[in-house]
């Protein structure tokens, strides 16, 4: 640990901008119009006070921001910094990196697992894990960080930053990868990014699952990526993603592409909801039915997500939802299924 007032610690913090102060946004400044511009690497070097203000935003917004990010920002020609100002105060910034445009031999090596070129997370993931080589040939801007001044949050500045950044930085598509949470995901969904790859393990630093999202127009491969995402993450809900929070599942379900389903016996499901049959005999149909109807639902109850989609045990559900045991859990499941049937007013053709 540093001694109180240690001169070396003070020097280190000053050089690496680790304790730069965020200026307050005065009321008169908050009324000024926003201005958006590129903050180039030469400008970062020539204007250290301005750089310190921008980097303070990044440190404040992202706990993993480190001196390595500062070095990359100043040295990596593939990186860019885009800022928003109100008066003299930086109220938002986007840090992004250029990816893609890889040649055919490199893409083939990526798909065979023999190469993983540094600085190309999105195209490598798409080519290696989804088998989409076209995305690796195309150009991409990946958003590494986006930060908004604490005094100016919940005012749409982040969305405006993205809009202006995309307008001024052409690419075939745009991407972002982050530790998914119920607070962050709605922002990216609202800005027309779609999920295409959900990690199977929680990040040790953030404690969250990593989610890769993309945005682009006229992408021949995007529908394929969405279908693969839908099949993969739903399949993993009962295995590697069993601990994924129901609130995040609720937010992801509307992005799920409806996959072909067998004819679903709704009469059997309704009879179960009213007390007939047993859970094991209808579980497969409940699973297929929820997946078929999920894209049209505004929300799905955490209990149905946990029991039917994540296939948790009765005991685990009882503990999670503070119910006494299997009988009480199953009764709650039946009640919610019946309510869902009534609300949806399903019109499937039923087999006899």
Q: Which stretches of residues belong to each language-model region?
A:
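Structured core elements
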Residues: 83, 93-95, 142-147, 175-177, ...
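A glycine-rich phosphate-binding loop feature that marks nucleotide/adenosyl-phosphate handling sites
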Residues: 29-31, 71-80, 179
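Conserved beta-hairpin
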Residues: 78-98
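Short secondary-structure subsegments characteristic of cysteine-rich extracellular domains
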Residues: 70-75, 213-217
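Short coil/loop residues immediately preceding or within conserved phosphate-binding loops
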Residues: 79, 138, 143
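Terminal substrate-recognition subdomain of acyl/acetyltransferases
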Residues: 1-63, 101-139, 167-352
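Conserved acetyl-CoA-binding loop-helix of GNAT-fold acetyltransferases
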Residues: 145-167
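Short, basic/aromatic recognition patches
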Residues: 61-73
């Amino acid at each position: 640990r540093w001694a109180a007032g240690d001169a070396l610690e003070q020097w280190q913090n000053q050089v690496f901008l680790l304790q730069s102060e965020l200026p307050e946004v005065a009321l008169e400044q908050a009324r000024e119009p926003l201005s958006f511009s590129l903050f180039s690497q030469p400008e970062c070097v020539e204007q250290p006070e301005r750089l310190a203000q921008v980097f303070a935003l990044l440190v404040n917004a992202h706990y993993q921001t480190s001196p390595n990010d500062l070095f990359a920002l100043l040295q990596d020609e593939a990186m860019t910094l885009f800022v928003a100002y109100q008066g003299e105060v930086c109220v938002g910034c986007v840090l992004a990196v250029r990816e893609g445009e890889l040649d055919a031999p490199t893409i083939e090596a990526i798909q065979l697992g023999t190469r993983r070129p540094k600085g190309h997370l999105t195209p490598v993931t798409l080519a290696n894990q989804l088998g989409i080589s076209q995305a690796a040939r195309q150009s991409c801007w990946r958003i590494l960080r986006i930060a908004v001044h604490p005094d100016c949050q919940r005012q749409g500045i982040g969305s405006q930053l993205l809009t202006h950044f995309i307008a001024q930085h052409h690419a075939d598509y745009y991407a972002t990868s982050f530790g998914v949470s119920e607070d962050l995901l709605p922002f990216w969904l609202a800005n027309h990014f779609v999920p295409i790859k959900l990690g199977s393990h929680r990040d040790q630093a953030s404690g969250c699952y990593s989610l890769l999202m993309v945005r682009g127009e006229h992408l021949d491969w995007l529908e394929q990526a969405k279908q693969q995402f839908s099949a993969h993450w739903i399949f993993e809900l009962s295995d590697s993603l069993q601990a994924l929070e129901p609130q995040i599942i609720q937010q992801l379900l509307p992005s799920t592409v409806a996959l072909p389903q067998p004819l679903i016996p709704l009469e059997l499901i309704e009879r179960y909801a009213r007390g007939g049959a047993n859970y094991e005999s209808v579980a497969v149909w409940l699973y297929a039915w929820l997946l078929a109807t999920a894209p049209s639902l505004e929300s799905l109850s955490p209990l149905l997500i946990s029991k039917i989609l994540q296939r948790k045990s009765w005991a685990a559900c009882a503990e999670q939802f503070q119910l006494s045991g299997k009988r009480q859990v199953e009764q709650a499941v039946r009640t919610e299924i019946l309510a869902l049937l009534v609300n949806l007013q399903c019109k499937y053709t039923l087999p006899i």
